[in-house]
């Protein structure tokens, strides 16, 4: 082998070895904190009286099936609402400069710093029995409207912590749009709505898919907010908690956890296949 080819191959092997070495800590962490616990969870889920039937019970047992469906529907509605609200806000904030803009962005993204229990408590202060909405409606309508502990209150809590995740993604995507494409569309006679429909929204498609998948997966597994608000709502995280603590049915809790993880992972994998890019995990 010629000397220059030998050196080139050596450098390539050296880079490959360094890359593998650099990935070793990540592989260790992923194995220790994800792969092994997930394998253990699958085994525990099949170790109860029902055996592997515990996984089938998620779909065929009425209570578990209803919980799964309601959780998926709630997560889907939250995703759609968050995309709609955050897209409008993200487009406006990225394309306009005005006094107080930085403060407004900070306020809109501030919920990322809150744990789910705090979000739930804020919904109680807003729409609980002694909340702001209840006081206003009592004075204006003579009847106190309370919905903090209903599916509407849970939806509001999920929406509150979901919007920031979409806004940040949309703003970053809008910043990368090519203004020349919009100018070309306007030159050809396209109106504002046509420009958004034919140019802007298609260009933002990967951002919609990525942020939507993150919101959906996060809403599927949100526990803190559900624990605070869902006293009479059987969303899947609460059913898992109930099976584990009150019923001491550890096998069923493990099986439900695996089912929840599969649905969340499938949404992220599907989004990745659609967008052709990376879908980051939400914190």
Question: What name fits each language-model region?
Answer:
Residues 177-181, 279:
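Short glycine/proline-centered loop/turn elements that form peptide/ligand docking sites
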Residues 185:
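The alpha-helix within a helix-turn-helix
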